[in-house]
Regions:
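Glycine/Thr-rich phosphate-binding loops that ligate phosphate moieties of nucleotide
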Residues: 1-172
Length: 172
């Protein structure tokens, strides 16, 4: 991992925590730009895991594997980090442009080529590579996720409010 560097990627719109800001904790003199880049990747994966675990709790179901697509999915390193953080196999589909694939699936279902979306997916989606979790790495990530990442927002939330007030008062 990042030698104890943990990032909380609260910098985008749509958060249910409007005062939240991105945060990085754990810096020391051993950290390099590599650690920072990796912390960004890991932080995004932690945020996705947090969201998935919320869905699993509400649905009373456990995800057994994860399909990935998009630009980041083209990196073997990112896919492996994702598998290690989630603790389940991650597979890359045959194209990273899955929006087009999804449209084709809907179209073929609508035209009656396939009777169900499940049939269309089964026939049109191909796995190109699977990344199995390294459970030793998962244990480390799980510790950081539960003991650090999940606690960051609660511990920093008062400071986020102060930062928001500061920005309103002193921003140009």
């Amino acid at each position: 991992g990042c030698d104890g560097l943990v990032l909380q990627p609260y910098w985008g719109p749509g958060l249910k925590k409007p005062n939240a800001r991105g945060a990085i904790i754990g810096f020391s003199d051993c950290h390099t730009l590599y650690h920072l880049y990796r912390a960004i990747i890991e932080g995004i994966a932690y945020a996705l895991r947090d969201g998935l675990e919320g869905i699993e709790r509400r649905q009373h179901a456990k995800v057994k594997e994860i399909a990935v697509s998009g630009g980041g999915s083209q990196s073997d390193a990112i896919c492996q980090i994702t598998a290690d953080i989630f603790g389940v196999p991650v597979f890359r589909v045959q194209t990273y442009e899955t929006a087009s694939l999804g449209c084709a699936i809907v179209g073929y279902k609508y035209l009656g080529v396939y009777n169900s979306y499940e049939d269309a997916v089964k026939n049109m989606v191909r796995r190109s590579k699977t990344f199995n979790p390294n459970m030793e790495n998962h244990e480390k990530y799980d510790y950081l996720f539960k003991k650090v990442y999940l606690k960051m927002f609660g511990r920093l939330s008062d400071m986020y409010v102060d930062l928001k007030k500061f920005s309103k008062k002193y921003s140009d």
